Design a protein with these regions (language model features):
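Low-complexity, Ser/Thr/Pro/Gly-enriched N-terminal "stalk/linker" regions
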Residues: 1-21
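Internal amphipathic alpha-helical repeat/solenoid segments
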Residues: 14-32, 75-89, 138-145
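Non-membrane alpha-helical segments in proteins
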Residues: 35-49, 61-65, 95-107
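Alpha-helical solenoid scaffolds that mediate protein-protein interactions
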Residues: 46, 59-69, 73, 104, ...
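Active-site lining segments of carbohydrate-active enzymes
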Residues: 82-199, 212
Length: 218
């Protein structure tokens, strides 16, 4: 965070987002996108560990920037010509963003301003929780998939609900749906030897998110 404090958070632009549709280049947009997530993670962790006022202030600025983005999904994962609600696309990174913000909301209750906490609840609910809960299962292609997308998206949504939703029937219904998707479909993608055909990197990515969700339920 000390290094990033001296840097300016890069801005996402419509021009960069459009590049994937125009020429197939997704890397320039993603470089900026993930740099912004680096700011979020760095100042979030610094705030959680050290609780310094300057880190909290910087984090609140970064959260405001993230919440002002037009779409949390990557440009390569949306279908603007087919889906009028493409800005609400829930992909790997959108679900991760929601989970990260929800976790910061829960762990920094006493440090974050009421305005920032309200912003987090509003945007994460609008972009992640409400669309998922309103859609009849399996509403997304990854919800009944046997690859890492299932565990990453489902796991992050489940953890987001744990941190943001009040205990009750609505929350339990969502968590039951998540557990069913992971246990019924994702785990079917593994062979008897515990391996998957996606490769080691994807195995770790999906399994890690499943384990994090399991731990968040404890």
């Amino acid at each position: 965070s000390d290094q990033l404090r001296e840097e300016k958070m890069p801005a996402l632009s419509r021009t960069l987002f459009d590049e994937y549709e125009i020429n197939g280049n997704r890397l320039r947009y993603e470089a900026v996108y993930f740099k912004r997530r680096e700011f979020l993670s760095a100042f979030g962790l610094a705030s959680i560990i050290w609780h310094k006022k300057e880190d909290i202030q910087k984090l609140e600025y970064v959260i405001g920037e993230i919440c002002s983005e037009g779409c949390w999904a990557l440009s390569a994962h949306v279908k603007r010509l087919e889906d009028p609600n493409w800005r609400m696309t829930i992909d790997l990174t959108a679900s991760e963003t929601g989970h990260t913000l929800a976790q910061m909301y829960a762990l920094l209750q006493d440090e974050l301003s009421e305005e920032t906490k309200k912003l987090i609840k509003t945007e994460v609910s609008r972009r992640i929780l409400i669309p998922f809960m309103k859609a009849k299962a399996p509403a997304y292609w990854w919800e009944d998939a046997t690859n890492n997308w299932n565990a990453v998206c489902c796991g992050n949504i489940g953890s987001t609900a744990i941190f943001l939703l009040e205990d009750g029937a609505e929350k339990e219904k969502l968590l039951s749906r998540i557990r069913y998707a992971i246990e019924t479909y994702y785990l079917e993608g593994f062979g008897a030897d515990g391996a998957c055909t996606e490769g080691l990197g994807y195995w770790g990515y999906g399994f890690m998110n499943m384990v994090v969700f399991a731990m968040d339920q404890r």
